């Protein structure tokens, strides 16, 4: 915990799972609205994460769109959307993930909570599919025969076409969490849909 520099100790001592060493989501309890956590989040995969796994403490269920965030120690919120919080579990490497919100908030959000509970924390394969530091990143990670794809962006809305050639010739069933039509006003707005991929 804290700002200890990751120095490769997890290679020498495999029982060391991850280090914080990051301006994680807990900072949103007291950070001024001038802090741009969303921009920070699309930079650290290219900088901090290169040196190893990190404890960011993602998973906020109270999500504020741009301009609606304010620091609140007793009921903290994230900047950005709910789907962004879910995608961070794929984009950020963290073998020992923490949950940043309260149990009652997770109980009120069973669909998001179920996704967080099911996502692996160690991976068999990881591929960065697309990205530009400070703007966006899309990462695919595989555990067994199951692939997870997560993408985050800065405050700019964008559509990204994902090249699914990494799936090979197999057929898959996809579950997609995506920002809802009102996510730019209410960060908690999202839609979950399922469809086949061939």
Regions found by a protein language model. Give the residues of each.
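Short, glycine-/Ser/Thr-/acidic-enriched flexible segments
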Residues: 3-4, 24, 61, 96-98, ...
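Catalytic cores of secreted or luminal carbohydrate-active enzymes
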Residues: 83-129
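Long hydrophobic segments that form regular secondary structure
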Residues: 65-92, 97-98, 142-147, 152-158
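Solvent-exposed beta-strand/loop surfaces of large extracellular or lumenal domains
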Residues: 176-197
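Active/binding-pocket-proximal capping segment
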Residues: 106-112, 155-158, 165-173, 177-183
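Aromatic- and carboxylate-enriched substrate-binding clefts and catalytic-loop regions
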Residues: 1-77
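Carbohydrate-binding surface patches
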Residues: 133-172
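Active-site proximal loops enriched in glycine and acidic residues that flank catalytic Cys/His/Asp
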Residues: 1-3, 21, 58, 102-103, ...
């Amino acid at each position: 915990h804290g700002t200890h520099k990751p120095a490769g100790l997890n290679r020498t001592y495999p029982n060391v799972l991850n280090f914080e060493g990051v301006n994680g989501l807990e900072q949103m309890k007291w950070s001024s609205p001038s802090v741009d956590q969303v921009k920070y989040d699309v930079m650290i995969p290219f900088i901090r994460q290169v040196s190893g796994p990190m404890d960011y403490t993602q998973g906020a269920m109270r999500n504020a769109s741009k301009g609606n965030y304010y620091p609140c120690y007793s009921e903290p919120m994230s900047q950005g959307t709910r789907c962004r919080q879910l995608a961070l579990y794929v984009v950020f490497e963290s073998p020992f993930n923490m949950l940043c919100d309260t149990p009652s908030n997770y109980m009120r959000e069973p669909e998001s909570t179920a996704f967080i509970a099911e996502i692996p924390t160690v991976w068999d394969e990881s591929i960065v599919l697309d990205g530009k530091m400070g703007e966006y990143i899309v990462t695919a990670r595989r555990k067994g025969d199951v692939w997870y794809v997560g993408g985050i962006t800065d405050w700019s809305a964008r559509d990204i076409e994902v090249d699914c050639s990494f799936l090979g010739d197999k057929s898959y069933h996809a579950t997609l969490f995506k920002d809802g039509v009102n996510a730019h006003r209410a960060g908690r707005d999202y839609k979950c849909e399922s469809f086949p991929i061939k």
